[in-house]
From Swiss-Prot:
Complex and partners: Part of the 30S ribosomal subunit. Contacts proteins S5 and S12.
Record lineage: Bacteria, Pseudomonadati, Pseudomonadota, Betaproteobacteria, Burkholderiales
Keyword annotations of the record: Ribonucleoprotein, Ribosomal protein, RNA-binding, rRNA-binding
GO terms of molecular function: rRNA binding; structural constituent of ribosome
Aminoacyl-tRNA synthetase in keyword set: no
Any one of the GO BP annotations: translation
Entry protein name: Small ribosomal subunit protein uS8
Stated family: Belongs to the universal ribosomal protein uS8 family.
Record keyword Ribonucleoprotein present: yes
Function recorded in the entry: One of the primary rRNA binding proteins, it binds directly to 16S rRNA central domain where it helps coordinate assembly of the platform of the 30S subunit.
InterPro entries from the UniProt entry: Ribosomal_uS8, Ribosomal_uS8_CS, Ribosomal_uS8_sf
GO cellular component: ribonucleoprotein complex; ribosome
Domain of life: Bacteria
Length: 131
């Protein structure tokens, strides 16, 4: 079965796994998914991630993070979709929950948070919001 939006599938798998308190979630790996997982780890939303499996079909394993029995990620929402791409210039990058959350943005310099994109002075495609 073909997945029309692999990033939305990744975010949904994370959301569903945290809803039932799973410690680990697995999914097919890609460069963009690994970059998103790296941003989530750097910002403290997930414990760890690793790529396992053979080179032809790598699998991304994400260790989810909980605090006092509650998921650290309260909300994770897809913004830009394959049918409706959302691009923001360097001056129009949104703040999530007045700076309490992050927006993950795909820029020419790679995938990064909204704060890093503002500091670097680049815009790009808004992939998702995380709070």
């Amino acid at each position: 079965m073909s997945i029309s939006d692999p990033i939305a599938d990744m975010l949904t798998r994370i959301r569903n796994a945290q809803a039932v308190q799973k410690p680990l979630v697995t999914m097919p790996s890609s460069k963009v998914k690994v970059a998103i997982a790296k941003v989530l780890q750097d910002e403290g939303y997930i414990e760890n991630f690793e790529i396992k499996g053979e080179a032809a079909k790598p699998v991304l394993h994400i260790d989810l993070k909980y605090y006092a029995g509650h998921p650290v990620i309260e909300r994770i929402d897809r913004v830009s979709t394959p049918s409706l791409r959302i691009y923001k210039g360097r001056h129009d990058i949104p703040e999530v929950m007045n700076g309490l959350g992050i927006a993950i943005i795909s820029t020419p310099q790679g995938v990064m948070t909204d704060r890093k994109a503002r500091a670097t002075g680049v815009g790009g495609e808004v992939i998702c919001y995380v709070a």
